A protein has these predicted regions:
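Short helix-loop "hinge" at the ATP-lid/N-box region of the Bergerat-fold HATPase_c
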Residues: 159-160
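Acidic ATP/Mg2+-coordinating residue in the GHKL
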Residues: 186
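Conserved catalytic submotifs in the C-terminal HATPase_c
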Residues: 129-139
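Short conserved segment of the HATPase_c
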Residues: 191-203
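Short beta-strand/loop element within the Bergerat-fold HATPase_c
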Residues: 133, 166-178
Length: 251
């Protein structure tokens, strides 16, 4: 029994590594399709859906197995690949985001707690702890629920990726200059000064991304572009070895 499970684990791990290689190769081909013809978006959507179907099957197989530390790690890896695929899909559809907007009143505190709960497996796996703070203010904003959830989720993943075990990620809702703001701060490795002006550039991974070897340079680009379409703003402050803070301003 032990030998059979080990074989299955090795197969699963091999699958994940293979799909990561496919993902890296696919990123390098996007610009070629984009420049050669107008059908590149169709190709991307089809490719992503095929990959997501394979990942769903693998996730179901893992969830049906006996719970273990190894299986938990594999599920986290599958979740990461799935999110990378969603980023590619959103990148392909970025020009049409404005058609998909539904602006409404959103309880920011409820959204944050919901997204934290959705990512609890990732928090547990990395031994990173979330903390939500509200500075005596309303937490209601006008925005698009789906896309705001996506943005907060991206910033959470970015913070966890560059945090150390036992670090905290702090969510602080506050008023600044009569504007509601959301700070998402970590106590992780921070960003070198030279990289900060470029972190929202497409495909830019910086020193941390190259060291981590798990960055595509897509997530923060999407965050900035979608926030602009929502009429919100974002800024970043960071100090190497002390952490990073992203602030979203809800105009």
């Amino acid at each position: 029994m032990k030998k059979r499970l080990q074989g299955t684990d090795l197969f699963t791990d091999s699958f994940i590594k293979h799909e990561n290689q496919n993902y890296d190769q696919f990123l390098s081909e996007i610009e070629n399709y984009k420049n050669k013809n107008s059908e590149w978006r169709t190709y991307i959507v089809q490719w992503v859906h095929q990959m997501k179907s394979s990942i769903s099957s693998m996730r179901l197989a893992l969830q049906n197995r006996k719970r273990s530390k190894e299986n938990m790690q594999l599920l986290v890896e599958l979740d990461q690949i799935d999110k990378q695929l969603n980023n590619i899909l959103n990148l392909a559809r970025l020009e049409a985001v404005y058609r998909d907007l539904k602006i409404e009143q959103i309880n920011l505190s409820e959204s944050i707690n919901r997204i934290i709960n959705q990512n609890k497996r990732l928090f547990i796996q990395n031994k990173v702890f979330p903390k939500v703070q509200i500075e005596n203010t309303t937490s209601t904003v006008l925005s698009d629920k789906k896309w705001l959830d996506f943005i907060i989720d991206q910033l959470i993943h970015n913070a966890i990726k560059f945090s150390n075990p036992t670090d905290q990620i702090i969510f602080n809702i506050k008023q600044t200059d009569n504007k509601l703001c959301l700070d998402i701060s970590d106590t992780g490795i921070g960003i070198i000064k030279e990289d900060i002006p470029r972190i929202f550039d497409l495909y830019f991974t910086g020193k941390n991304g190259r060291s981590n070897n798990n960055s595509s340079g897509i997530g923060l680009y999407l965050v900035k572009q979608i926030l602009e379409q929502l009429g919100h703003k974002i800024k970043v402050e960071s100090e190497q070895s002390k952490g990073t803070k992203f602030t979203i301003y809800f105009d």
